[in-house]
Amino acid sequence: MRINFKLILIILTSFYGIINCQSTCPYSKTVINGASATFYSAMDNGNCGFGKLTGPTGPGNYMIAALGTKLYQNGAQCGQCFKISNSKNASVTVMATDSCNDAGYCQRDNHFDLSPTAFSILGAQSQGVLDGLSYVKVPCRVSGNVKVMLKDGSNAYWTSFLVFNNAIDVKQVSIKLSGSSTYVPLTQTTYNYWPSSITAGSFQVRIESIGGEFIYVTIPSVVSSKIYDTGSQFSSSC
């Protein structure tokens, strides 16, 4: 019996993502110095769109940070992880889930507004602000696969995608309608969604990491607030 491997590959990618694997770390290991940190308590429902941190789209813990205005980069850093260290070699890894827009510290080039739990690993809360920190970007220690949620209010004429639970940073999200051979790139918003007005019928979402890997998931029709498991996760040798 002759097996059509090409057909099998097409069937697999129509439902779950096949990753173009890469063996190198997509992050620069250069340590950035001169960072600072404060802490805040209103951590749920941050600007990155993850909602409640222990909810279905959140990281599942409170090891998070709101990024200063410059570091936030209009939402491009949402869902990415940073290992922050102090001069005493204490370190903590946090995920970016929010932006810090207040005047003052949040306007510094490399400022993190941490959860009280994360802040306390680096210094006493009584200090209020920590200076002289360093950081490096690292893969996120997530469990399971990359997931996609369709924004509340999505319909057959407009929808917006939240990509979450990704171990490696997302570079681009694109969609391809059923019957088309062309992927249309979407533009990320400052609140970390990827909107589209061409979602009639079945379509495929393609998620590209900064390491050049791709994950695919087919969405048969638009259902507001529905979460899709892509069945795949980005790899990393970091």
From Swiss-Prot:
Family matches, as Gene3D superfamilies: Expansin, cellulose-binding-like domain, RlpA-like domain
Entry keyword set: Disulfide bond, Glycoprotein, Secreted, Signal
Signal peptide span: 1-21
Disulfide topology: 48-78, 81-140
Domain Expansin-like EG45: 45-145
Entry-linked CDD domains: DPBB_EXP_N-like
Glycosylation sites: 89
This protein's record includes keyword Endoplasmic reticulum: no
One GO CC term, this protein: extracellular region
UniProt xrefs under InterPro entries: Expansin/allergen_DPBB_dom, Expansin_CBD_sf, Expansin_CellWall, Expansin_EXLX1-like, RlpA-like_DPBB, RlpA-like_sf
Main location as per UniProt: secreted
Subcellular location: Secreted
Family: Belongs to the expansin family. Expansin A subfamily.
Role summary: May serve to lubricate the movement of the cellulose microfibrils during cell growth and wall extension and/or may serve to maintain the fluid state of the slug cell wall.
Protein name, entry field: Expansin-like protein 5
